């Protein structure tokens, strides 16, 4: 079986000395299956911000999952930090987070069905983004994810959209935002990106959810 992972820098393994220490590789080695890692640093789920026209949004890359035996979609962090659009609703269009998540869920169900997909939400952390409306990675833009971003949304609002919309399509969700045991002071390199211990924690959480659902 091949497990495909669609994600951002966390799925890519940003900051790790060895990419094989990333959560996706840890899961696939443990399960003895093939890994297809489609993590790209800085990418949003919506066609917004830096991904408006570059073809790298989750929406634009969703087709990469078509041959997967099981697919994990893990995103939303960059939509919170870097989108140039407010959340919107499912009718707002695919350049707004809610509209993009609705399109992703609708299309992945058509592609794979509900039994071969897991949606994973962001975890609580401390990162650099557009808290002050900036577009650059500056330390002055650092903040906890319980604070509102430039558009007036905290990370939990993005998580709620993921949970609600996935539920509308009967897609299972692993809500890391509500999981206990992750501490960004211990499990990240920089407040956001997981270190080796952080990836081990992710592999445990996500791997358990996959095992419970995969054939």
Task: Identify the residue ranges that each predicted region occupies.
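A short helix->loop->beta-strand "cap" motif at the edges of active sites that frequently abuts
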Residues: 112-116
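Ser/Thr-glycine-rich phosphate-binding loops at phosphate-binding pockets of nucleotides
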Residues: 8-11, 195
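Short hydrophobic segments within beta-strands
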Residues: 6-7, 120
